[in-house]
Amino acid sequence: MKNKILVTGGTSHLAKSLKKYLPDAIYINGRADLDLTNYSDTLEYFKRESPDHVLHLASKVGGIKSNMENPFEYFYDNLLINTNVFRACKELGIKRLTSILSTCVYPADNVEYPITEDNIILGDPEKTNRGYAQSKRILAELTDLYNQKYEGEYNYIIPCNLFGMEGSYDPNKTHFLTSLIYKSAKALSNGDAELEMFGSGKVLRQFVTYDDFARILVYCIDNNITESFNYSPDYNLSLIEYGKIIEDITDGRIKVKFNGNGPDGIYRKDADNRRMKLLATNFEFSDLKESIKEVLDFYLENDNI
């Protein structure tokens, strides 16, 4: 019999990709469906739907500026969401819970790169998103300790930065690469030759598409993968290098310039992907340059976004 899957965060960009591969799953589409900060409502909803597997995507997210200005809100709201989802799964005996974390859970200093899954609580996270990171760390600890005590099949996946065709553009919630692509499309539409981005451009980041990450989630379901792991590609590029890809795709019509203003965030946070490769031996990432071009074309064709 096919497992019944419940997905939190059904309006997220990742969920929009996931719906293409898991159309029959139950998606919680924001607070209109369920307020995950309310435990009694969460428990009642989960009890009524009675899923076999919960994919926990929901979280309060934002960019560096928003995280720096509101660390308490990011910690408190996400702590409520995560513990309520976890508690409901535990109380109802739901067999599988897969939670989505972020590489921001890893220490900012005194760590070897690429960073492995056993380094989550070995130092303080990057201060620019401390509140969000700490809430995700607690979720990882809950998962590990639950499995240790109950021999459970709960796990978490730690993806690198994601990008894709996000629809409406929100500068306060968008990662660098989607912002770069969106602004490049606007510059092309306006006939501008130079695009200015904040920061030094020297920091290193890994980016993969929402679609690719959705595919690995489905792969884990289909192959009953219950271990926790990092999800990341082999490359780790500077933001300047991502800018060069844009310049190449646009045949030099766009020149990307970094103005040196604003916080860069942590210099690097590339994740070790050896465990992922052992677990998902047949999985292949989409080509980065082609994926960036697809997103750029999307924004050019939808210039009202």
Where on the chain are the PLM-derived regions?
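Canonical Rossmann dinucleotide-binding motif of NAD(H)/NADP(H)-dependent dehydrogenases/reductases
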Residues: 2-24
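SDR active-site strand-loop-helix element
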Residues: 8, 29, 54-60, 97-103, ...
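C-terminal substrate-binding subdomain of Rossmann-fold SDR/epimerase-dehydratase oxidoreductases
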Residues: 12-13, 19-21, 186-305
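Conserved Rossmann-fold NAD(P)-dependent oxidoreductase catalytic core, especially the SDR/UDP-sugar
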Residues: 83-129
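NAD(P)-dependent short-chain dehydrogenase/reductase
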Residues: 109-113, 117-118, 144-221, 245-247
